[in-house]
């Protein structure tokens, strides 16, 4: 029987230069795999907890304690186990932690091991990770949401909304969709430069200039799509991530960049106006995570017209998603493995969403690495969409390049952008 022979974690840096956990699992047959845990900037209050060291080292953001938990407590429990029983391995770590939010061992410790075990098991069986986790039915290449203009917590500018994204929905295969997206991205840069805008990049590779309001970035994206030779609304559509919890204060939505303070109803009306004017097909976190009444208003007004994605709202947590299903709010969920903390729990949440006709969007975090686990995971779970930043910066393109590799390897791969909306 093949078993887990060694588990080791060390501290490495993410794309923002902050420490994170890298877990490495070695099996008795010599198979070995590592996984690097991502970290978010705008985080939901109900997310599983990253364990940070505090103190002066790395300005308090060190993860040596989380690594120590892997190398002692977790390793002692899992060494000798079969790597192929992912659910049992994850459950043992959950029991060992014993807290609702994984604050004892740290979600960053637990997830690193969970991912590394899955990858080591796949290597042992000489299977690609997506095939190991998804089986024979893992065939769908996700339609990317490419964050090409950054605002909010992802950029140092006056734009309130956090992400302005393009979705190449009008193409027949992933490679062509990605090519078109890259062309729009580079065309956008030329337009910004021509108008004297700064083209510094935000955390996720998008441009982060100042604009006069929250609508102007959309105008630039439309121009870039057209100048690149594509049709807005047909070949390439637009998605927004408002990350509105970041500007929700005392029951109101404060759009500082526009000097406006809006109620939930007024904010929803603003979104309806934008959707009527531009080819917007998806809005993420349109209202704040604690504003369930606002979410109901948003869903009732726009839920039959566009995709409404819950990120901070659901935090990849099946219990919170179940509440949303029962209340009839949102119609899609963002899937971030580090919000919940294990591979198995992430898969459970995806299955619950899909059973209830909620779309699933696999997602990176703003603090990423060269680890492309989520590319395989998106295909394994037949998530129809993926968010992993602009087609720039190595940690973002690692995911796109892996998806290109997967697309070439699957006979009969499906790209369903045209059928999403």
Curated annotation (Swiss-Prot):
Subcellular location field: Cytoplasm; Secreted; Cell surface
One Gene Ontology molecular-function label: phosphopyruvate hydratase activity
GO cellular component: cell surface; extracellular region; phosphopyruvate hydratase complex
PROSITE patterns: ENOLASE
Keyword NADP: no
Disulfide bonds: none
Pathway recorded for this protein: Carbohydrate degradation; glycolysis; pyruvate from D-glyceraldehyde 3-phosphate: step 4/5
This protein's UniProt keywords: Cytoplasm, Glycolysis, Lyase, Magnesium, Metal-binding, Secreted
Cofactor annotation remark: Binds a second Mg(2+) ion via substrate during catalysis.
Binding site for (2R)-2-phosphoglycerate: 162, 336, 365-366, 387
SMART domains in alphabetical order: Enolase_C (SM01192), Enolase_N (SM01193)
UniProt binding sites for Mg(2+): 241, 284, 311
A Gene Ontology biological process term: glycolytic process
Cofactor field: Mg(2+)
HAMAP family in the cross-refs: Enolase
Protein name in the entry: Enolase
Species of provenance: Nautilia profundicola (strain ATCC BAA-1463 / DSM 18972 / AmH)
Annotated gene: eno
């Amino acid at each position: 029987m093949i078993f887990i022979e060694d588990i080791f974690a060390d501290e490495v840096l993410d794309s923002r230069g902050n420490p994170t956990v890298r877990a490495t699992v070695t099996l008795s047959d010599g198979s070995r795999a590592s996984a690097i845990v991502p970290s978010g900037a705008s985080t939901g209050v109900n997310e599983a907890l990253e364990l940070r060291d505090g103190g002066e080292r790395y300005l308090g953001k060190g993860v040596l304690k989380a690594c120590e938990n892997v190398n002692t407590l977790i390793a002692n429990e899992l060494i000798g186990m079969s790597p192929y029983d992912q659910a049992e391995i994850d459950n043992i770590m959950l029991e060992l932690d014993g807290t609702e939010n994984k604050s004892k061992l740290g979600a960053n410790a637990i997830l690193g091991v969970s991912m590394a075990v899955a990858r080591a098991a796949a290597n042992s069986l000489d299977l690609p990770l997506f095939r190991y986790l998804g089986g024979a039915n893992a065939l769908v290449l996700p339609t990317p949401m490419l964050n090409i203009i950054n605002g909010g917590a992802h950029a140092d500018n006056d734009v309130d909304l956090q992400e302005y994204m393009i979705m190449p929905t009008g193409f027949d295969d992933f490679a062509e969709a990605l090519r078109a997206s890259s062309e729009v991205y580079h065309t956008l840069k030329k337009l910004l430069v021509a108008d004297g805008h700064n083209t510094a990049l935000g955390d996720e590779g998008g441009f982060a200039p100042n604009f006069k309001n929250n609508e102007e970035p959309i105008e630039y994206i439309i121009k870039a799509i057209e100048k690149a030779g594509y049709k807005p609304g047909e070949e390439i559509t637009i998605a927004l991530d408002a990350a509105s919890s970041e500007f929700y204060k005392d029951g109101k939505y404060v759009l500082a960049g526009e000097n406006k303070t809006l109620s939930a109803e007024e904010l929803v009306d603003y979104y309806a106006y934008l959707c009527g004017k531009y080819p917007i097909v998806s809005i993420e976190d349109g209202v704040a995570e604690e504003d369930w009444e606002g979410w109901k208003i948003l869903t009732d007004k726009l839920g039959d017209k566009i995709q409404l994605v819950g990120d901070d709202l659901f935090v990849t947590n099946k219990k919170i998603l179940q509440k949303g299903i029962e209340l009839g709010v949102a119609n899609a969920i963002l899937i971030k493995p580090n919000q919940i903390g294990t591979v198995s729990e992430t898969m459970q949440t995806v299955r619950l969403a899909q059973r209830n006709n909620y779309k699933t969007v696999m997602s990176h975090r703003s603090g990423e690495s060269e680890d492309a686990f989520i590319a395989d995971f998106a295909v394994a779970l037949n998530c129809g969409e993926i968010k992993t930043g602009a087609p720039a910066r190595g940690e973002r393109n690692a995911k796109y390049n892996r998806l290109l590799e997967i697309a070439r390897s699957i006979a009969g791969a499906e790209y369903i952008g045209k059928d999403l909306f």
